[in-house]
Amino acid sequence: MKQFVRPEFILLKEGQDKNYGKFSVSPLERGFGITLGNAIRRTLLAATPGASVYAIKIAGATHEFTSIPGIIENVTKIILNIKQLVLKIDTSIYSDDEVVQLRIRSDIQGPIYAGDLDIPAGVEILNKDLLIATISEGGVLDLVLYAKNSRGYKTFKDNKNEKNIEPGMITIDSNYSPIIKVAYSVDSAKIGRAIDLEKLELEVTTDGSITAIDAISIASRILVAHLEFFIDLNREISVLEVIGTNQTDDKELDRTVEELDFTQRSLNCLKRAGINTLRELVSKNEDEIGSIRNLGRKSLKEIKDKVASLGLAFRQS
């Protein structure tokens, strides 16, 4: 049986706070780019666990349409503000569905921010400058937020069925997903003479409670867990027999730069820099290539395009 080529996962770009990442996976057999891309995207958006507030309790408020004397915002506006709160609840301290309470009681005139909330150990507020409410003269804000770890999106009606809902609590919509955006694209890739391969690129943006690369790892684990049932149907087939190593990699990387059809100017610059093989070329990062003497923008673009067309990438800085 023909073995599948083992792909390589490469970090192409990462935000300074690591909540954004762009990644590539290649080479993939034809059809697997969109298969994996769509599966990972849907799992990231729908099944990645996170933390959210699902109910609140405000002294003097019995429902979301209440106005509280001495508080500028009505309860509806306060709820809209709270729904923007970004939380991180430590799963090593709190079990799934274990409720944590964030509290504040203040009569100090002025704005109340998320950072003013009293929080228990193991809970972190990532957007502390988020406005919660504003106290005017003579006002008192007595507020409790109820939050937990879960996954997916639940409406305030769904949350009314939670077992720990008590009289006086107002349920709100809760979005537990830490994923803000996921996009993927599939391009052709080739290794040696094999031209019917694909490269999958993924872009992931999170709310900061999880890094982009951790989000992909968790989503992949969720997918694997769901596929284990199908693997168990026939234990005689080993995954290691299905996916083989890429035996063409070494030969491909040992190709000389003369074999890569560069223009004479680009070829001369690479040779003068001591770069004689494809392996030596991709062992450099993009800045090192760009700093080669007499290598202009046009030549740099030619080299970058050639490396990309081979389904490879420069070393990350």
From Swiss-Prot:
Record has Nuclease as a keyword: no
Catalytic activity: RNA(n) + a ribonucleoside 5'-triphosphate = RNA(n+1) + diphosphate
Record flagged with keyword Transport: no
Sequence segments annotated as region (Alpha C-terminal domain (alpha-CTD)): 250-317
Molecular-function annotations in GO: DNA binding; DNA-directed RNA polymerase activity; protein dimerization activity
EC supergroup of this enzyme: transferase
Keywords linked to the UniProt accession: DNA-directed RNA polymerase, Nucleotidyltransferase, Transcription, Transferase
GO annotation, biological process: DNA-templated transcription
Location of the region described as Alpha N-terminal domain (alpha-NTD) in the Swiss-Prot/TrEMBL record: 1-234
Entries under SUPFAM superfamilies matching the protein: C-terminal domain of RNA polymerase alpha subunit, Insert subdomain of RNA polymerase alpha subunit, RBP11-like subunits of RNA polymerase
SMART domains: RPOLD (SM00662)
Segments traversing the membrane: none
Cellular component GO terms held in the UniProt record: cytoplasm; DNA-directed RNA polymerase complex
Record-linked Pfam families: RNA_pol_A_bac, RNA_pol_A_CTD, RNA_pol_L
EC code: 2.7.7.6
Coiled coil: none
Similarity comment: family membership: Belongs to the RNA polymerase alpha chain family.
Functional summary from the UniProt entry: DNA-dependent RNA polymerase catalyzes the transcription of DNA into RNA using the four ribonucleoside triphosphates as substrates.
Notes concerning its domains: The N-terminal domain is essential for RNAP assembly and basal transcription, whereas the C-terminal domain is involved in interaction with transcriptional regulators and with upstream promoter elements.
Complexes and interactors: Homodimer. The RNAP catalytic core consists of 2 alpha, 1 beta, 1 beta' and 1 omega subunit. When a sigma factor is associated with the core the holoenzyme is formed, which can initiate transcription.
Protein name in the entry: DNA-directed RNA polymerase subunit alpha
